[in-house]
């Protein structure tokens, strides 16, 4: 988000200007001057800055708070292996958000940022890629740290569309690209499997909005999780519905088909619990029990 545009779209949907999904928005991510995603416009370089930034996004109507704990891959000069905030700043972000009744998500690529985010009380880790601090190593997976994440109850979101969608059976990628992606995929497979084995709560996400990752291709991530990561179709569906709903504190409202919950429903042609690609054959979309799309009327 830049300029709180997602909150404006959310308001337009709520006011009935056009149909759309249920949007839960964080507004611009809180980062540092010259930090990852600095061009989104919300910088914080001290404890007071962090406190002010959290209060500011909540004042504007954010549903939750996002802080960019480590550098990232798509910002020139940013170092994804290193923390951008001090442990004290991360604690202030979490405590201030929680005081205001909001949960906090942390963009987290480097292993250096995991312990400070754990100690700060961050609610969800986005990516959690275990990138090594030393550039001589690519990744640094630490089982005891993973067990600590599991014990804390933190949910980790894995973005599995991006590079990996070109490895799906119906895609054709240049051979050189496939070789590079396969190497990355094998490393991801190992970390993903170990995190699941050690009991970390996992949710599937997309990082949609970045180059090459479209909002309408979310299902590709579920297919990658099943085809390449060894998840069952039903586990992948739960990791993109029930688990994230619970991670957002909305498990009593959405995420499962239970009497009394909001009727946010997608119906597909086929049995997605057996064949994950059935999710590509959408026949009905409902929000709050109201039909937004029906294949029978779309034509």
Region spans (language model):
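Divalent-metal coordination cores built from histidine and acidic residues
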Residues: 1-102, 145-175
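Active-site glycine- and acidic-residue-rich loops that bind
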Residues: 2-7, 41-51, 105-108, 129-143, ...
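Short hydrophobic/aromatic-enriched beta-strand-loop microsegments
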Residues: 19-20, 25, 122-133
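Divalent metal-coordination and catalytic microenvironments
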Residues: 23, 61, 65, 97, ...
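Charged helix-capping and loop-helix junction motifs
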Residues: 81-91, 139-143, 184-186, 219-221
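His/Asp/Glu-enriched, well-ordered alpha-helical/loop segment
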Residues: 99, 174-176, 184-271
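Catalytic cores of alpha/beta
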Residues: 110-119
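Glycine-enriched alpha-helix->loop->beta-strand junction motifs that scaffold or abut catalytic
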Residues: 118-124, 150-155, 172-176, 198-201
């Amino acid at each position: 988000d830049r300029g709180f545009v997602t909150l404006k779209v959310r308001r337009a949907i709520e006011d009935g200007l056009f149909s759309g999904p249920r949007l839960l928005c964080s507004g611009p991510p809180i980062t540092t001057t010259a930090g990852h995603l600095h061009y989104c416009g919300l910088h914080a370089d001290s404890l007071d800055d962090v406190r002010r930034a959290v209060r500011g996004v909540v004042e504007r109507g954010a549903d939750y708070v996002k802080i960019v704990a480590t550098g990232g891959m798509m910002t020139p000069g940013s170092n994804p292996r290193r923390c951008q905030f001090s442990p004290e700043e991360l604690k202030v972000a979490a405590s201030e958000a929680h005081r205001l009744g909001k949960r906090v998500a942390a963009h987290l690529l480097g292993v250096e940022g995991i312990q400070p985010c754990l100690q700060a009380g961050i609610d969800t880790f986005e990516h959690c890629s275990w990138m090594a601090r030393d550039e001589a190593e690519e990744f640094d997976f630490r089982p005891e740290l993973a067990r600590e994440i599991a014990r804390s109850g933190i949910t980790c979101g894995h973005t599995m569309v991006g590079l990996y969608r070109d490895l799906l059976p119906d895609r054709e990628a240049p051979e050189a690209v496939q070789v590079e992606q396969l190497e990355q995929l094998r490393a991801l497979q190992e970390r993903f499997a170990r995190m699941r084995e050690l009991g970390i709560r996992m949710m599937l996400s997309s990082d949609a909005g970045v180059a090459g990752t479209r909002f309408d291709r979310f299902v590709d991530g579920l297919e990658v999780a099943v085809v390449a990561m060894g998840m069952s179709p039903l586990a992948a569906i739960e990791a993109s519905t029930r688990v994230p709903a619970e991670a957002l504190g909305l498990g009593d409202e959405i995420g499962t088909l239970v009497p009394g919950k909001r009727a946010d429903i997608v119906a597909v042609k086929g049995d997605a619990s057996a064949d994950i690609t059935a999710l590509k054959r959408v026949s009905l979309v409902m929000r709050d029990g109201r039909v937004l799309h029906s294949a029978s009327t779309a034509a």
